[in-house]
Amino acid sequence: MGQMEEYEELIAAARCEIEVDLLLLGGSVANLISGEVRRSDVAVHKGRIVGFECSSARQIIPLEDQILAPGFIDGHVHIESSMVTVPEYARAVVPQGTTTVIADPHEIANVWGEEGVRYILQSSRNVPLNVFVMLPSCVPATDMETAGAALGPDALVGLFEEEGVIGLAEVMNCPGVIFRDPQIMKKIQLAGGRLKDGHAPGLSGPDLSAYICAGIRSDHECTTLAEAEEKLFSGMFIMLREGSAARNLSDLLPLVTLKNSGQFLFVSDDRHPADILREGHIDFMLRKAINEGLDPIVALQISSLNAARYFGLADLGAIAPGYRADIAVLDGLDAPRVTHVFKDGRLVARDGDFLAPMNRPVKAMHKSIHLAALSRRSFEIVAEKGPARTIGIVPGQIITRSLPLFPLIREGKVVSDTDQDILKLAVVERHRATGNVGLGLVQGLGLVRGALATSVAHDSHNIVVVGTGDEEMLAAVSAVTEMDGGLVAVADGEVLASLPLPVAGLLSESHMQEVAEGIAECIDAAHKLGCDLEDPFMTLSFLSLPVIPELKLTDRGLVDAVAFRMVPLFLGGSLEDD
């Protein structure tokens, strides 16, 4: 059917001249454009809403006493944080009312580059979830680590032409923008009139203005009311984030008023399987916002319409004639729960059950772990004078402290000290078999025996391992390698628990429930080894992220993430940082 014929059929359906495909009967429409809730039937034809008055339909679904709202839109998400493939991600979030996500495939791009982005795009086809992609702007994140790939301007040229790509994802290199680094400016230029998302924690004053003048219109990194207020006053869209590691919704919600609410979007950023399954997705943020006093209609606008308008998705975000029939049916507005989900006019979920047929998934490229030969000696640290820069974990946060501590030394070598909780930490390069092994120390994990390792290690996703002995660390890295990526806890050379993540070392092809159970088993094993952190693997995965203060470890060594430079492990006899 050509476009003109489709328009003519939709017009006929809207005039009730022909039988429509679907009639949703007896509910009330949350009209986010007019800002009201009104009792009304909804007629759907060819995947589009065609009106409110037709009575003849091939299928009628009664929805008495329920609220029909537009399907929810997540304005910024790294799907890879869910540790499942796109089809399995859809299986989990669609029953929670999410029908559209704006994805930044930054994680898989750090492993597979262009092919990683294309894998996400291809995996997103023929699933009952709109997946629009913003191209990663900073791969690799820094030159102080070894990533699996690089996405330079030349790589972005072709990717911008791919169906489903709508802009440039979070521009993390704020100094590069402000001081006009040629590489980042070229990427911004290539984006042209497409949207450019921001990532500007703490940026303020003239630097913020300069950053915005590059065409960057949003930010999801606000953590304080004052920061969000300045960025709002400067014209930015504020993404209200409620992830797993970063939860900022409650802190920022007081800024939302009836006059400015159109500038806010809900985003999950990084949300892990257990949180999605236990709490929810955008529906969780909707309930939380309403519970904290936000008007339900405003909360629904932030859940869908605002994102649709910001991203230029003109036929999403409302229940009105001509819009796509992506609908989340709610049991009320006080603490809304999703009862039915329609995608393009098809019932795809009911009462939490996923109903849509799923096509055979795109075949993933496996074998992403490529290590040089390792031995116990790969983890040896030769002692030097003075205290050592030690990564100090801050429970519940991804920032760390840089602590000058004296490690335990035996026969001229640094060994893990379980009494002081100063453990050896290593980041093993796994993309190019370079043989790089960054060595450091960490305090706060609490292991008294064994080792933990993971191939999920932001942002370059090398293998990060912590342990009470070199043999244990080697055993943990070997176990991750044998699984072609994943999480593992070992003790006495034996694997206690593991979760294989064979897709890029980041994702499982199993259901999210199975992945969540696997993570829980790994965490439980870590707790039995002495670690008392709520999620030690999440903590471990951020110890290699050199763009977050204060001290981090990459495969190339220790990084002072405040001064943004490589530093030696030992301070050379002084307690003052050099």
Regions found by a protein language model. Give the residues of each.
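Active-site microenvironment of metallo-dependent hydrolases
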Residues: 1-45, 94-96, 277-293, 297-578
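Divalent metal-coordination and catalytic microenvironments
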Residues: 27, 47, 65, 76, ...
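Active-site mouth loops of central-metabolism enzymes
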Residues: 74-85, 140-153, 217
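Divalent-metal coordination cores built from histidine and acidic residues
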Residues: 2-13, 89-195, 259, 495-499
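Active-site beta-loop-alpha junctions enriched in small/polar residues
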Residues: 78-82, 106-108, 136-141, 171-174, ...
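Histidine/acidic residue-rich metal-binding segments in metalloenzymes
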Residues: 150-169, 175-240, 246-266, 277-291, ...
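Short acidic, glycine/serine/threonine-rich loops at helix termini
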Residues: 112-116, 142-148, 179-183, 207-211, ...
